[in-house]
Amino acid sequence: TPFPGNAFSFVDVGPLSVTFSGDSAGTLTYSVQGDGTGGNGSTVTKTISRQAFGTLPVCEFTGSDRSFATQNFQDLWWNPTESGWGINFTHQSNTIFATLFTFEPGVGNNNKGLWLTASMTRQSTGVYSGQLVKVTGSAFDAVPFVPLNPAVNATIVGNMRVEFTDGNTGTLTYDVNGQSV
């Protein structure tokens, strides 16, 4: 079933900034205003560092077509005919860590946002696949922030698979609680 591109709305909840202090470190600062979305107007500042789980890619800006790229698929991907969802791929060595942002199943246009993650490994066929996980944790403004405990906060909800045709095109398939997409 195609994703209904008109089934979402945006609410500006506040500013966000990232300041880098080097190639692998920085500071993330954001505020969520008290506008009925759960924010209380507090400002949160977090120290961030690059998450390295393989050989880091060498990235260079190019204005040219990426269709020839077959070695690194790190990017923010979406289907332009299904605006409202997307997937971020962080690609290092033979692993792609994916963060899928979409909406919970339901009827109508008021479904809650849903974030799922997958750590996918490259198979001998060139396909990347792995388990799809839903995590829960501390609120964005929790002080102190309680780190994620995978044994408590992570639930396997399905599987994810991505096969790239080239650097611009791929096919993503996944299932959530038995429902295939």
Label the model's feature ranges.
Residues 1-181:
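Mature soluble binding/inhibitory domains
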